């Protein structure tokens, strides 16, 4: 097979995402004709990459914000070019003001047209701040959480000021429980848990089935390479899938504040205490810069020999 051109950027990014060695990363990219996701799977099958490495670790700067107004909550992300600007009071005030409007706006397109106190639209206000702050600023995304009855818990990790920080989480608990204070406390605890454990779905049925099948295939091929009999492989794969669910499905994760219990068990206990059904209606978790990729400029010397030969 003729060797295709593999860029230094691709090699370094694959190394950062998987923890594998640079030569192994280059080989994986060559073997998969440069397909990044297939290269990750290739390394995992060879036991060269940690399965738990998550996408979206290349960070951008700025702030996320969480805002709750009764039974409505919103999370937004506004990006800047440097962390220095994220600590700028003018920028922080801008993000807070946008978050306050986002609760009413419901969608990001509508939000951009909403008028701020200055009389300018959100979009115009951002452009003006670009000029005064001196960096490119972007209202990147927003998501809204609404419930008809229950409680919304919010948590912001690495706060620079209240409700603004690196990770913002909302958790909506649908319930007709009378003790709203205890329900809100539970929602807050689950929000802290979500910030720390980064679940991918509420339950296994809502988990992306393509992701599940991808994991199943990786586990199967890795077990096969270990030379196990087919009947043993089937049991091993199902065991590993169950473990995978316990790592990425919120209800199956061990609860941060009571590690001997799953989140589902904690909710069951709360239902007994409060005398009402409790359901996680939705959660939102924004981590600053997740999924944003940057051009790398200072690693060419490190990988030149590998990528050229």
From Swiss-Prot:
Predominant subcellular localization, coarse grouping: cytoplasm
Region (Involved in Mg(2+) ion dislocation from EF-Tu): 82-85
Keyword Protein biosynthesis in annotation: yes
Family annotation (SUPFAM superfamilies): Elongation factor Ts (EF-Ts), dimerisation domain, UBA-like
Keywords in alphabetical order: Cytoplasm, Elongation factor, Protein biosynthesis
Subcellular location: Cytoplasm
Gene Ontology MF, one: translation elongation factor activity
Gene Ontology annotations for the cellular component aspect, listed alphabetically: cytoplasm
Positions of transmembrane segments: none
Similarity comment text for this entry: Belongs to the EF-Ts family.
Purpose: Associates with the EF-Tu.GDP complex and induces the exchange of GDP to GTP. It remains bound to the aminoacyl-tRNA.EF-Tu.GTP complex up to the GTP hydrolysis stage on the ribosome.
NCBIfam families: tsf
Protein name stated in the entry: Elongation factor Ts
Native source organism of the sequence: Rickettsia africae (strain ESF-5)
Gene: tsf
